[in-house]
């Protein structure tokens, strides 16, 4: 447990907070690792089988109906639990092939990231995208190499791959013994102990550790002569040629501690969690329009990074997820809201274990809480007491896929419009309208194709509105930030279209990069942006 001043004080509560996101490529085992962290914390007693989700228990962090049907994480869940004196907030990001803006936004609320890598596949495309977002924020990144119970790449090759592809050096905290399907366990470099591999009851409950000192005369027999000799050679090579552990570099995001294990069998999960909590940082200062705001600033402040409607069909409600940046949150407190520039009362605050909720009396920097949203909150809104500070708006990432959507049943038009607007405000989709055309026809833009399927599913199940969808050829949207003439007088290629976004800002939809260049060359003084602020 961290050294803390007075229990219950702002400083003490902040010091024991850890807020992190798990990032990975699809099928690296992210939801499984999340489940196992909850298992070891005591938050759940048995872990649901992710692969056998239709017939077995559903994973705790996958709560939306479509996720349970497909066995994937579509939205980002926020979960809180206690372990060894720490208060932990996990942000579980989508792990399917077509991820959405939700994935990027969650990283804005995290203080550190756990990068999950499949031992057999190494660094993959989606991991690279998410890693870049983490590097931009300079947050600490911890690496867990998963699926060691199967044949995988040589660990030295994985380290080299991380440095060449991601540009970050790795320092193994433990080291695998056997990577060709003959996995025997890991060697913990800091304690000089070998933890022998035990698969337990297929990972449903906690595994009791079996540790053997490196100098134990029984070890060669336990591992076999070949693996024992290889381990001793690799330890020597690591000590001579490997990067030494430097906590300062880790906390700057310049060196990643590397762990090996098997989340599905629980092996290596507890040692990873223990060391992660020791090495990671408590909530840091956040930049605002009035300068840096330290976490222990007595004035309360936070920002909205996610909005989710209908998390529980029984409630039919809408929740805004807020990351607390400073001060103490208390139930029923009155705060200044940047979106309306008014004082509002925060009622019914909640914390989560996926879709299970608990009422919140108090919360501290680093915590994620859900606020009942009557329709006033927007992504990027700031909430605070004292000085009227604003945190940077969460950027709108340019969608890459577009479709024209309309209601099949004209009598359900009201539900259709309400559903599309609400999903747009959540950030699940982006909407665009052509000039002179009303809500009868809306252009929807998404970062990943699966979001179209999510849109159809949610409109049908939550709003009883079925839609007609026609794929459009556009692949780019650009926001007009400066124009030399009236918008309607701009010269555009025949395949490009003018439109307005949900905040009535002018945009151009393009089919290809050539059309973008043509527009810029034929309209001197025209300036286009790839992203837009949600505050503007």
Regions found by a protein language model. Give the residues of each.
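Structural and coupling elements of P-loop NTPases
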Residues: 1-536
């Amino acid at each position: 447990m961290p050294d803390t001043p007075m229990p219950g004080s702002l400083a003490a509560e902040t010091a024991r907070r850890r807020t992190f996101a798990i990032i990975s490529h699809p099928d690296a085992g992210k939801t499984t690792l999340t489940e196992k962290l909850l298992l070891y914390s005591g938050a759940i007693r048995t872990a649901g089988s992710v692969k056998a989700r239709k017939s077995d228990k559903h994973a705790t962090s996958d709560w939306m109906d479509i996720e349970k049907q497909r066995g994937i994480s579509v939205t980002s869940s926020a979960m809180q639990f206690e372990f060894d004196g720490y208060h932990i907030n996990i942000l579980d990001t989508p792990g399917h092939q077509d991820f959405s803006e939700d994935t990027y936004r969650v990283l804005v609320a995290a203080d550190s990231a756990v990068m999950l890598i499949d031992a057999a596949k190494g660094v993959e495309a989606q991991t690279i995208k998410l890693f870049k977002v983490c590097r931009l924020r300079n947050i600490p990144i911890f690496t867990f190499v998963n699926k060691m119970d199967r044949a995988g790449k040589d660990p030295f090759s994985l380290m080299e791959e991380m440095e060449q592809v991601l540009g970050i050096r790795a320092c193994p905290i433990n080291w695998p013994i056997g990577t060709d399907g003959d996995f025997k366990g890991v060697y913990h470099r800091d304690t000089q102990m070998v933890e022998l591999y035990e698969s337990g009851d297929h990972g449903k409950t906690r595994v009791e550790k079996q540790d053997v000192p490196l100098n134990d005369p029984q070890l060669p027999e336990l591992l076999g002569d070949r693996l024992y000799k290889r381990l001793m050679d690799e330890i020597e090579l690591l000590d001579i040629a490997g990067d030494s552990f430097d906590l300062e570099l880790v906390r700057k995001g310049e060196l990643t501690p590397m762990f090996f294990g098997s989340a599905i069998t629980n092996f290596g999960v507890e040692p990873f969690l223990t060391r992660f909590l020791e090495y990671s940082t408590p909530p840091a200062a956040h930049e605002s329009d009035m300068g840096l705001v330290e976490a222990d600033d007595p004035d309360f402040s936070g920002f909205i990074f996610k909005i989710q409607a209908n998390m529980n069909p029984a409630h039919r409600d809408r929740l805004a997820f807020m990351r607390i940046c400073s001060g103490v949150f208390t139930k029923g407190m009155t705060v200044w809201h940047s979106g309306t520039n008014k004082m509002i009362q925060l009622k019914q605050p909640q914390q989560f274990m996926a879709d299970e909720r608990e009422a919140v009396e108090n919360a501290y920097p680093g915590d994620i809480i859900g606020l009942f949203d009557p329709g006033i909150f927007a992504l990027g809104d700031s909430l605070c007491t004292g000085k009227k500070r604003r945190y940077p708006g969460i950027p709108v990432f340019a969608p890459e896929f577009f479709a024209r959507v309309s209601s099949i049943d004209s009598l359900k038009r009201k539900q259709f419009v309400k559903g599309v607007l609400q999903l747009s405000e959540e950030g699940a989709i982006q909407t665009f309208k052509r000039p002179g055309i009303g809500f009868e026809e809306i252009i929807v833009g998404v970062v990943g194709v699966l979001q179209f399927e999510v849109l159809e599913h949610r409109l049908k199940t939550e709003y009883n509105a079925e839609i007609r969808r026609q794929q459009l050829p556009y692949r780019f949207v650009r926001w007009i930030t400066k124009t030399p003439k009236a918008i309607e007088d701009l010269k555009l290629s025949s395949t490009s279209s003018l439109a307005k976004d949900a905040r009535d800002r002018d945009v151009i939809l393009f089919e290809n990069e050539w059309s973008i260049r043509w527009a810029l060359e034929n309209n001197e003084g025209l300036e286009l942006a790839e992203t837009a602020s949600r505050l503007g």
